[in-house]
């Protein structure tokens, strides 16, 4: 089959159990196109049921789903790429850009807008055989609600290949309430490449609305299965590097209530890790976070953040709280302020700067005839004896 089309426009009382864009148990469909407006559906697969497809395209608007959504096939490969637009719709369980126990040999691209996901959203696939060989992109805007977590990778499904570590996972969050955590990587799987997490960062291509993240932002993946007590960070969830960009410019409400990790949760990266925070809080209206941890470089510009601190069971002092932990370099710039309830652990370098474009100028202060002159006003406040 060259091209398959499934179209539903404003159906009345339409209820469908399973939708497949491709064939059933055999054959190959080159391109699948699913366009649904309205209706109630249990499970949806952009690809086939145990039957390969080349490319899948799924656009839904105003639908209700009671099961799960897959951009790929069910136990069936997609030979090239998947493309998903999930708009003004709701789903009771999880949404995946990839397949269920089926590979995607190219890329996955998922756009969630003005929608409700009562489970988690994954850019990748579901299950150990649901590898995405190329890149993954997940973009969320327009006051979407994700009740659980957001992953730039899959669920127990790798992204990229061990012998070709060039995959890129990109998360773009322009407007959403996410009650759980944000992960640049996968859930209990490896991303062979690098992750880029953009939260409110130059999201001009999307509809900006308030951003609320109830949990923690991890540049990497979730290493531990539920109930696993092992948190030694020996698992490598991202092989080539992590970048987190947080920019609250032009947002009225923008809050992250957990910590910010340049690693995964109980997982690490072999490459460099960067956290860039801009326009996040003011001196009189600072942002509340728990900690900043496990990264090579943190750059904070024009921001004010209160860090309450937390423990790290892998530290020698495992019951001691730290506001900043295992950060190789901290750059505080452009009139930024940190309020630290607890101290720092293994912070190797700290600089106070004025940054203009790519130019960095070390903070200076002069006192002349009782007049104080600064080129920048960065501050760090710590509780006594901390």
For each feature predicted by the language model, list its residue ranges:
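Outer-membrane translocation/initiation segment of Type V secreted surface proteins
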Residues: 368, 372-386
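Surface-exposed loop/turn motifs in large extracellular/passenger domains
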Residues: 1-18, 23-43, 49-68, 74-94, ...
């Amino acid at each position: 089959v060259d091209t398959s089309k499934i179209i539903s426009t404003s159906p009345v009382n339409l209820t469908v159990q399973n939708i497949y864009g491709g064939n059933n148990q055999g054959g190959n469909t080159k391109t699948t196109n699913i366009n649904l407006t309205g209706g109630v559906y249990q499970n949806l697969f952009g690809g086939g049921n145990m039957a390969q497809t080349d490319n899948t395209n799924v656009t839904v608007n105003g639908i209700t789903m009671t099961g799960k959504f897959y951009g790929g096939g069910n136990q069936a490969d997609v030979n090239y790429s998947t493309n998903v637009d999930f708009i003004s719709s709701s789903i009771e369980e999880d949404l995946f850009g990839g397949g269920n126990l089926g590979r995607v040999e190219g890329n996955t691209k998922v756009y969630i807008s003005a929608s409700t996901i009562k489970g988690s959203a994954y850019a990748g696939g579901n299950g150990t055989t649901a590898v995405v060989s190329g890149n993954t992109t997940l973009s969320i805007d327009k006051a979407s609600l994700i009740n659980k977590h957001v992953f730039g990778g899959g669920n127990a499904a790798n992204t990229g290949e061990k012998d070709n570590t060039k995959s890129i996972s990109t998360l773009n969050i322009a407007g959403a309430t996410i009650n759980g955590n944000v992960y640049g990587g996968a859930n209990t799987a490896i991303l062979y490449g690098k992750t880029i997490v953009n939260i409110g960062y130059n999201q001009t291509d999307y509809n900006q609305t308030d951003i609320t993240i109830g949990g923690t932002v991890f540049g990497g993946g979730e290493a531990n299965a539920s109930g696993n007590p092992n948190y030694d960070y020996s698992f490598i969830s991202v092989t080539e590097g992590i970048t987190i960009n947080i920019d609250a410019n032009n947002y009225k409400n923008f809050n992250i209530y957990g910590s910010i990790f340049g690693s995964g949760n109980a997982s690490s990266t072999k490459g460099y890790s960067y956290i860039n925070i801009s326009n996040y809080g003011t001196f009189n209206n600072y942002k509340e976070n728990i900690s900043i941890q496990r990264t090579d470089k943190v750059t904070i510009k024009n921001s004010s953040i209160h860090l309450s601190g937390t423990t790290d069971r892998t530290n020698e002092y495992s019951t001691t709280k730290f506001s900043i932990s295992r950060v190789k370099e901290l750059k505080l710039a452009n009139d930024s302020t940190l309020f630290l309830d607890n101290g720092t652990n293994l912070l190797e370098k700290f600089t106070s700067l004025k940054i203009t474009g790519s130019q960095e100028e070390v903070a200076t202060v002069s006192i002349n005839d009782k007049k104080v002159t600064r080129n920048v006003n960065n501050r760090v406040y710590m509780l006594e004896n901390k």
